[in-house]
From Swiss-Prot:
It comes from Salmonella gallinarum (strain 287/91 / NCTC 13346). Belongs to the DegT/DnrJ/EryC1 family. ArnB subfamily. Gene3D superfamilies: Aspartate Aminotransferase, domain 1, Type I PLP-dependent aspartate aminotransferase-like (Major domain). It is an enzyme of class 2 (transferase). The modification N6-(pyridoxal phosphate)lysine is found at K182. This is UDP-4-amino-4-deoxy-L-arabinose--oxoglutarate aminotransferase. Its EC number is 2.6.1.87. GO terms for cellular component: membrane. Catalyzes the conversion of UDP-4-keto-arabinose (UDP-Ara4O) to UDP-4-amino-4-deoxy-L-arabinose (UDP-L-Ara4N). The modified arabinose is attached to lipid A and is required for resistance to polymyxin and cationic antimicrobial peptides. It catalyses: UDP-4-amino-4-deoxy-beta-L-arabinose + 2-oxoglutarate = UDP-beta-L-threo-pentopyranos-4-ulose + L-glutamate. Pathway: Nucleotide-sugar biosynthesis; UDP-4-deoxy-4-formamido-beta-L-arabinose biosynthesis; UDP-4-deoxy-4-formamido-beta-L-arabinose from UDP-alpha-D-glucuronate: step 2/3; Bacterial outer membrane biogenesis; lipopolysaccharide biosynthesis. Keywords: Aminotransferase, Antibiotic resistance, Lipid A biosynthesis, Lipid biosynthesis, Lipid metabolism, Lipopolysaccharide biosynthesis, Pyridoxal phosphate, Transferase. CDD domains: AHBA_syn. InterPro entries: ArnB_NH2Trfase, DegT/StrS_aminotransferase, PyrdxlP-dep_Trfase, PyrdxlP-dep_Trfase_major, PyrdxlP-dep_Trfase_small.
Length: 379
């Protein structure tokens, strides 16, 4: 239908169009100066020393795990309540994902669940900053330091998120996403931030065939025209067309996230009169990026299942999302981990629903959603 309200829509404007035109006019459309500008700008946002732009956050996770030497016989701890790409990358490297439960109300992985899963084979911990809120980094990094295990923050939802006064990523290594539904987007893309120069160098090589330099370095940096492969790598570089869009979006981040926060506040107020349960907020000091606004639809409380609610909203021209179906309940992982039970993850996975939330959402759009929820709830 022509007036269908999606659960997410990118906020694009004249600035993004102008940025693309500038790159097209320059004659250099693949990885080049706009990538360098984006990496520098993102370091200013997070406070990190190094940033490496990549073709997706999944690509960033892949090469980050590779740079840590993750492989056969290793274990990596991650929540099951996450997008499956993290699990897939662990498995594709020959390692074993150790999926742990989350807090029932915030959907954040807890230090208690992480510590219980640590073994001599544990080679990395991947906490997820879920829906735009931060995980408890003090406790998680303390575990990493105590056991000598690297922490890689999955910050795909967390551009603009802070924990105790510091932007996510400032503590170490984090991976952000520029996918089409994220707080800032360039259609597809991502970026890895770190303060470790050797780690950053490995990422740069792995993202571009395993070469020591990329094409722009060879053209503009006074480097030798022929580069050597240092180790087998991938083709995960971000074109400057995408980097230019991400830069334009980054300049709008504060305004975009402020609008998201305003809509989330309206949702919280409206939910007081509805049976649907929003996620709880973390108790520690933080700034929430409001990537998603998630409710839990418990049939005993709401007299409707989550799937039926989503179907009903769709008939009313309103889109929703599911973030996420727990990884360990999906066919591949279900068959390989048949005895794994994660009660709070499973309870939420069966009930969570993402409502429309994006910066260009109007008051009329918001009213449509709330009116529809009241109708479905029989109010």
């Amino acid at each position: 239908m022509s007036d269908f309200l999606p659960f997410s829509r990118p906020a694009m404007g004249a600035e993004e169009l102008a940025a693309v035109k500038t790159v097209l006019d320059s004659g250099w459309i693949t990885t080049g100066p706009k990538n360098q500008e984006l990496e520098a700008a993102f370091c200013r946002l997070t406070g990190n020393q190094y940033a490496v732009a990549v073709s997706s956050a999944t690509a960033g996770m892949h090469i980050a795990l590779m740079a840590l030497g993750i492989g056969e016989g290793d274990e990596v701890i991650t929540p099951s309540m996450t997008w499956v790409s993290t699990l897939n990358m662990i498995v594709l490297l020959g390692a074993t994902p150790v999926m742990v439960d989350v807090d029932r109300d915030t959907l954040m992985v807890t230090p208690e669940h992480i510590e219980a899963a640590i073994t001599p084979q544990t080679k990395a911990i991947i906490p997820v900053h879920y829906a735009g809120a931060p995980a408890d980094l003090d406790a998680i990094y303390a575990l990493g330091e105590r056991y000598g295990i690297p922490v890689i923050e999955d910050a795909a939802h967390a551009t603009g998120t802070s924990y105790k006064g510091r932007h996510i990523g400032a503590r170490g290594t984090a991976i952000f996403s520029f996918h089409a539904i994220k707080n800032i987007t360039c259609a597809e893309g991502g970026i890895v931030v770190t303060d470790n120069p050797q780690f950053a160098d490995k990422l740069r090589s792995l993202k571009f065939h395993g070469l020591g330099v990329d094409a722009w370095d060879r053209q503009s940096g006074g480097r030798a025209p022929q580069a050597e492969v240092l180790a087998p790598g991938y083709k995960y570089n971000l074109p400057d067309l995408n980097a230019a869009i991400a830069l334009a979006q980054l300049q709008k981040l504060d305004a975009l996230n402020a609008r998201r926060a305003a809509i989330a506040a309206q949702y919280h107020q409206a939910m007081a009169d509805l049976p649907f349960q929003p996620l709880s907020l973390p108790s520690w000091e933080h700034i929430h990026a409001w990537h998603l606004f998630i409710i839990r639809v418990d049939e005993a409380r709401c007299s409707i299942t989550r799937d039926a609610l989503m179907a009903s909203l769709k008939t009313k021209g309103i889109g929703t999302g599911l973030h996420f179906r727990a990884a360990h309940t999906q066919k591949y992982y279900r068959e390989r981990f048949p005895t794994l039970t994660l009660p709070d993850t499973e309870w939420n996975s069966e009930r969570i629903c993402s409502l429309p939330l994006f910066p260009d959402m109007t008051e009329s759009d918001f009213d449509r959603v709330i009116t529809a929820l009241h109708q479905i709830a029989g109010q």
